Amino acid sequence: MNNLRLQILICKGTGCVSARSDLIKENFDRAIEHYKIKDVEAMITGCFGFCGEGPIVKIEPDNVFYTHVSPDDVNEIVAEHIIHGRPVKRLLYKNPKNKEPIYNQKEMSFYGKQTRVALKNCGKIDPENIDDYISYDGYQALLKVLTEMTPQDVIDLIKASGLRGRGGGGFPTGIKWQNTYNSPGEEKYIFCNADEGDPGAFMDRSILEGDPNSIVEAMTIGGYATGAKHGVVYIRAEYPLAIHRLKTAISQARDYGFLGKNIFNSGFDFDIEIRYGAGAFVCGEETALIHSVEGKRGEPTRKPPFPSVKGYMGKPTTVNNVETYANIPKIILRGTDWFTSMGTEKSKGTKVFALAGKVNNVGLVEVPMGITIREIVYDIGGGIPNGKKFKAVQIGGPSGGMITKENIDTPIDYENLREIGAMMGSGGLIVMDEDNDMVEIAKFYLEFTQDESCGKCTPCRVGTKRLLEMLKNLLDDKGSEDDLQKIEDLCHNIINSAACGLGQTAPNPILSTMKYFPDEYLKYARHEVKRAYKINKDKCIGCHRCARECPVKCISGNPKEKHEINEDKCIACGTCFKTCPVGAVVEPK
């Protein structure tokens, strides 16, 4: 903070920007100038993680955390807190149990069990200012690597740390680097997979928006270790803010000599370019990603050969995702003992999750491997809204599985998740309560993967389409119990014969929900699911038309009053839906 008395940290991640944090920053600058305050600075930061409470403003070193800040609140914060030292209570986060304001971020339950490694600088530094990154030990790991370590030393350190890929399967990062290093040839490449395709996942985007220099530094370290002189970041074009900040970081790194020729006078040359993806989910698979960068169709190829042997332009290529890279500089500087002290025996370090769904606190959480779903949902997430019961967590994105109440205390790591029919994936974590229909959930994810299939292999292209047809028949009251066995058999056939990970894991949500919620499938197969229309009382105008037209007289309510449908008597004929002039009648699922 240099000679500053206070720093005003304003979140400018995508979520807060959409809620006008740009204007919040402008208003703080104007107010500071208006009051002629010389020892206070307003600066932008990346995502704080607590996205459900944004826009967020934090005052340092007071550690006061303001939530739901609007541009109109700025003058009050400056007049009360900055000038007179009185925090604005109405903007503080409220304890959900007693509604008392919490002044200090460290006392908030959302952050209580988090351990920030990959997200360490997000919410602390200005992501568009390389000097800020340097002040937090930025590029010190690169200096150490280039002046004190051989490439094999670096690889051995990453191996010893136990770091595993954070993008899906959890392959050991050090072994992947070793394979590329061992591959013959002078021309090698290192890629960063920033094509974050899971619905609801935004971990990688937030790291690139909040700490882009950490990825530049890590890729340069990886290039040195594997023998690559050229790096490529493959990022989806739908991430304009992340792209802007990554471009800024690369440009500034070149200006400072951290990229380019003879970095730190070591004789090592390395540079990075950005390539854009069009949002295809399948391009998150490393061979499809490489094909896309080469200008080809984004289709996976069978392995071996692996990219570490034959990748981009036929040359050895390393592919890691954003979160994996974000761990590298910290491991280099703090050592393997520090990193291995977090996590479980086979899954070291932390994992970032995008917590969403039926939970009170939504946002990004970074927790040590080995934490339980109960701790994430109830201690960090604040529990289920409206007193509803926990039903399941969907983990691993569209290709993942369910963690139910029976497994809510299972420590989360790669092996444990695999044993219960789920997977780590990139880190999507969707909480579901007693009202969620698990057959509908399975259909939702299958619709996504079926739509995202590249179409190269028949099991995925045709198999997922047939699966979806059978699921829709069940939900439309056209299925039978025989269909359940057909669905399960087709799931296993697709898994065993699809060409790539997308097809091989597409049936996971179906198999997982069939395993843990068989009764819900049986109810549909036996035609026991009651289908009834409902009336949205906020829209109902009491015109009484629906009640007059209903053939079974199951709608109650006098003219000019809110009406209600008796769901036990409703035959789902749709007459009320067609009759209502204001769209107040809601169709059954």
Give the ranges of each region predicted by the language model.
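Short amphipathic, charge-patterned alpha-helical segments
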Residues: A218-T220, M369-P385
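Flexible inter-domain linker/hinge segments
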Residues: L92-A160, M313, N320-G335
